[in-house]
Amino acid sequence: DLPRWGITQNPLIYGNLLIVASQTSQAGVVAYDKLTGELQWKSAALSGNAGYVSPSIIKVGGEVHLVMITASMGRGRSASGGTVNGIDPLSGEVLWTYSNWQCRIPVPHAVDAGEGRVLITGGYSAGTAMIKVQKKEDGSYGITELFKNPDFGAHTQPPILYKDHFYTQYTINERSDGLVCMSMDGQVKWSTGEDPLFNKGGSILIDGLLVSVDGNKMLYLIEPDPSGFKPLASAELLEQGENWAPIALSDGKLLIRDQKQLKCLKVAQ
């Protein structure tokens, strides 16, 4: 069966591979030759329900791992079964699994926090967890949970990492924290709340500045600073609605969209 909200994952290009989150009972993740479409490998089925997470890449020591997150069964304290999986991107072998963070509808992909650290975030009160992956002498992998924090999460977009701090829009069905900043050790530094409200919109880092759609009509240019929210400019560019799409930048042109239109903005001199 198709997920309720459709197939929303992005495929991942890694070298000559096109990697997709199949999330079936036959294979959790599948890789194809990006030019010919020939099947290269498929992973084992992953524990947990199908979600909306795209596969992402992290580094563990000198190795590259593919990370895939699955959805939990149930919600709240009864949620269980969801997993975070590290996979060899060249063979599809599942290298490690972490199961102490649960989200019934996960969407944001895992974020590489450096030094083998992986940040995992979700909505529906799942909050965030950071783990550290290390290779053991016997060739297996150990997982250390560094922290969990219910006051930092993300409903649709992955957090942005800049100078050892994470920035995310944490407005979900249960709370309206707006734009939130968290340190590398899991301490929330500030949040905008509802003034201004940031509600699941896309963000991108450009030349050390945060460009964010507020999930509604506004586009913001923000200086990412752990001491406080520092907006530099804003403009009403979109029609009102649930404007949660990712932002894209190419050749000095910024692409944003609402429910009716796609806009291309020149942001480079």
What kind of feature is each model-predicted range?
Residues 1-269:
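Noncatalytic, solvent-exposed loop/strand surfaces
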